[in-house]
Amino acid sequence: MDENKKRALSAALSQIEKQFGKGSVMRMGDRVIEAVEVIPTGSLMLDIALGIGGLPKGRVVEIYGPESSGKTTLTLQAIAECQKNGGTAAFIDAEHALDPIYAAKLGVNVDDLLLSQPDTGEQALEIADMLVRSGSVDIVVVDSVAALTPKAEIEGEMGDQLPGLQARLMSQALRKLTGNIKRSNTLVVFINQLRMKIGVMMPGQSPEVTTGGNALKFYASVRLDIRRIGAIKKGDEIIGNQTKIKVVKNKLAPPFKQVVTEILYGEGISREGELIDMGVEAKLVDKAGAWYSYGDERIGQGKDNARTYLRDNSQVATRLEAELREKFQPAEAPREAGDDEDKE
């Protein structure tokens, strides 16, 4: 760059800093690139699949899937992990369906959990924005986008046609929220539902679509698709679900990784079940017939007994987890690639 251009650029940068404050514009080389702070999900498999060890702070995350697939369970486990590390969590319950007894079973400290049950979508998103701007909340969960009903719809008559109202509300809210989320380093998780597009018959095209328009797809740094794929039985009794979680979008690590984990009723994601499955895959746990062995020790006949053994012997489980983390530990998060999609 010639001297005249350098002087012109220097003058422009000085003017920008004077008008908008120091750090408004900076060279990438002058900026300290730090590893992204994360909140663990409560699932070791998913933390590794995300590539950064959990859900990224200072970002928007979308978790979507069919009904009863484990969306709220996953967010409550992330809240529990956040609280274990001394963080503050907020849950905006637009569906008015949070069960505090179930949340407590998953390890959530319900006495310290900030809960809001707003009347309208505008109120829910305004509360989320105020909590984010306070800079004192580590994770805010909005459950769910589908339940964020615009005020005009609530005040209108049943059957009124108000096309695109919720999509416009989400687009406007996310434009306002994203800057505040980055500045306050808060993780904001939106739970979303699936709907079916009528008339989609093209091969290769999915008829499924998430609610609330396209804005959330663009603004989210991570999108997780969670689905129930089978039942877990103990004898004839169903005790949980086999669940597949796919990382559909990831701006901080390679996407499209997927994991199959177990969600047990009244317990949440089975940590011990994951340790056994990952241990077998990593050849740290031997499986001979129905027997599972770790080191020189037999830990159980059948997965359910092995799971119980690890639950009762926490030192063994902790040692196995440490070995698995060492083997699968994700590398430090790379710099984020520029997202060239236009935000709408």
Swiss-Prot record:
The keyword Cytoplasm applies. This is Protein RecA. It comes from the Bacteria. GO terms for molecular function: ATP binding; ATP hydrolysis activity; ATP-dependent DNA damage sensor activity; damaged DNA binding; single-stranded DNA binding. It is found in: Cytoplasm. Belongs to the RecA family. Gene3D superfamilies: P-loop containing nucleotide triphosphate hydrolases (3.40.50.300). Pfam families: RecA (PF00154), RecA_C (PF21096). One of its GO terms (cellular component) is cytosol. InterPro entries: AAA+_ATPase, DNA_recomb/repair_RecA, DNA_recomb/repair_RecA_CS, P-loop_NTPase, RecA-like_C, RecA-like_N, RecA_ATP-bd, RecA_C_sf. Can catalyze the hydrolysis of ATP in the presence of single-stranded DNA, the ATP-dependent uptake of single-stranded DNA by duplex DNA, and the ATP-dependent hybridization of homologous single-stranded DNAs. It interacts with LexA causing its activation and leading to its autocatalytic cleavage. Residues 323-337 have a biased composition (Basic and acidic residues). GO terms for biological process: DNA recombination; DNA repair; SOS response. ATP binds at residues 65-72. The keyword Signal does not apply. Keywords: ATP-binding, Cytoplasm, DNA damage, DNA recombination, DNA repair, DNA-binding, Nucleotide-binding, SOS response. Residues 323-344 are annotated as: Disordered. Its main location: cytoplasm.
